């Protein structure tokens, strides 16, 4: 935690094969399935997390769902980036915060 905890927002992201969890100042603020849906014609993001999970194997031919992580490792970097960016946007804005969020990252190098 920073010098003025009420003015800062620290974010931690746990990328999991099944779910991605984002915490802000020690509290879970995002807990979503690790999946995205993209439009195959435009390559644009259509849905993230729970919304994308609901589309999995039930959508139009143009919509493809992707699970960016496999066996605990990033299998599709572009999809992982889209998912992370989208989930960061899901974080509720902290009232009174004067500074941009600080991202805390832990990278595991051993299988769990």
Please give the residue ranges for each predicted region.
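Nucleotide/phosphate-binding catalytic cleft detector across ATP-hydrolyzing
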Residues: 1-112
């Amino acid at each position: 935690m920073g010098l003025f905890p009420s003015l800062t927002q620290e974010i931690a992201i746990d990328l999991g094969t099944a779910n991605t969890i984002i915490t802000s100042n020690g509290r879970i603020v995002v807990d979503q399935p690790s999946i995205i849906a993209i439009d195959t014609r435009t390559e644009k993001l259509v849905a993230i997390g729970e919304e994308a999970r609901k589309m999995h194997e039930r959508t139009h031919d143009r919509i493809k769902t992707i699970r960016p992580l496999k066996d605990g490792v990033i299998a599709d970097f572009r999809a992982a980036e889209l998912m992370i960016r989208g989930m960061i946007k899901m974080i509720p804005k902290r009232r009174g915060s004067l500074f941009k969020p600080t991202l805390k990252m832990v990278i595991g190098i051993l299988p769990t």
